[in-house]
């Protein structure tokens, strides 16, 4: 068992918030993202973001400029290395798959974006341009809940550990050695050596906005626990992966045209659902720059 989110309080006066599950995710209405946001409305959006970790706004037919402007309310926009940008807007990157593409869908494993960087993204702001009537959902899970549901003994065991991250399985040497290649509509050709570069982050981090602790591991970018042998590290990481991805820690968002979604990249994992073969799907995203994760 784990604690569900508390019922909505009276603090939301400028926006309407409808939770998606008892763990994370909320729909926000009563706001027009095409217009500048006053401080009171923005503070409520930020409050909902820190509370629900994943928030989405239906029916927001925003332009690229408005997409960028809204994203900058969360912090500086800093595109990730792997994705192509749309013409004329380097800050806006594409998640696009043609109906006839047959390569692997990018992001189809549970992961946190770009943890191979020294300062991974803080948040991602994504909007749906053209999506299938059904299929192509995105799943999210709460790394707060994953941490909070560990036993006190396990928490004490892992809280001081660090994990080595790299992109070797995504565009480094391990990726080059496998056959499961991503389709190339959205993905840049990346330098293999850059993919093999390693960085180290704490296994448990404290969110600077909410003050809550969360696990910070994912099977896409994590290579090993620092200072352990593979025989010691692998089973512990595997346990944490399996624990974090429990179904009751998740939510699933169904995309609709003109929907804008923001996820907190420090305290969640997400994955694409590759169930829309033969259908065109096009979303754009901006990435909010982060700081080095810390305990």
Curated annotation (Swiss-Prot):
2-oxoglutarate binds at residues 138, 255, 281. One of its GO terms (cellular component) is cytoplasm. InterPro entries: AtsK-like, TauD-like_sf, TauD/TfdA-like. The keyword Metal-binding applies. The keyword Lipid biosynthesis does not apply. GO terms for molecular function: 2-oxoglutarate-dependent dioxygenase activity; metal ion binding. It catalyses: (R)-2-(4-chloro-2-methylphenoxy)propanoate + 2-oxoglutarate + O2 = 2-methyl-4-chlorophenol + pyruvate + succinate + CO2; (R)-(2,4-dichlorophenoxy)propanoate + 2-oxoglutarate + O2 = 2,4-dichlorophenol + pyruvate + succinate + CO2. Optimum temperature is between 35 and 40 degrees Celsius. It holds the Pfam family TauD. GO terms for biological process: catabolic process. Signal peptide: none annotated. Pathway: Xenobiotic degradation; 2-(2,4-dichlorophenoxy)propanoate degradation. Keywords: Aromatic hydrocarbons catabolism, Dioxygenase, Iron, Metal-binding, Oxidoreductase. Fe cation binds at residues 111, 113, 270. Changing residue 106 to A: Loss of the dioxygenase activity. The record marks 221, 285 as: Contributes to enantiospecificity. Its cofactor is Fe cation; L-ascorbate. Optimum pH is about 6.5. It is an enzyme of class 1 (oxidoreductase). Involved in the degradation of the phenoxypropionate herbicides. It can also accept (RS)-4-chlorophenoxypropanoate, however it can only accept 2-oxoglutarate as oxygen acceptor. Homotrimer. Belongs to the TfdA dioxygenase family. This is (R)-phenoxypropionate/alpha-ketoglutarate-dioxygenase.
């Amino acid at each position: 068992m784990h604690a569900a989110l508390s019922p909505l309080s009276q603090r939301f006066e400028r926006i309407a918030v409808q939770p998606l599950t008892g763990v994370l995710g909320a729909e926000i209405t009563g706001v027009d993202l095409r217009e500048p946001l006053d401080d009171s409305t923005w503070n409520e959006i930020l409050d909902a973001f820190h509370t629900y970790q994943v928030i989405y706004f239906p029916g927001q037919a925003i332009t690229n400029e408005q997409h960028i402007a809204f994203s900058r309310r969360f912090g500086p926009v800093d595109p990730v290395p792997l994705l192509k940008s749309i013409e004329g807007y380097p800050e806006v990157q594409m998640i696009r798959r043609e109906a006839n593409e047959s390569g692997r869908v990018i992001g189809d494993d549970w992961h946190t974006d770009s943890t191979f960087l020294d300062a991974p993204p803080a948040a991602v702001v994504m909007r749906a341009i053209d999506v299938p009537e059904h299929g192509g959902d995105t799943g999210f899970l709460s790394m707060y809940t994953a941490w909070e549901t560990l036993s006190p003994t396990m928490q004490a065991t892992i809280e001081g550990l660090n994990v080595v991250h790299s992109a070797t399985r995504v565009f480094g040497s391990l990726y080059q050695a496998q056959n499961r290649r991503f389709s190339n509509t959205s993905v840049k050709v990346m330098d293999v050596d850059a993919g093999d570069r390693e960085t180290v982050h704490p296994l448990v981090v404290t969110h600077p906005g909410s003050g809550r602790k969360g696990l910070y591991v994912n099977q896409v970018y994590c290579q090993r626990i620092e200072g352990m042998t593979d025989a010691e590290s692998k089973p512990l990481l595997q346990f944490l992966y399996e624990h974090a991805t429990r179904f009751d820690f998740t939510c699933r968002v169904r995309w609709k045209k003109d929907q804008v979604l923001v996820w907190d990249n420090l305290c969640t994992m997400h994955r694409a659902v590759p169930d829309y073969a033969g259908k065109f799907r096009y979303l754009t995203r901006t990435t909010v720059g982060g700081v080095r994760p810390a305990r």
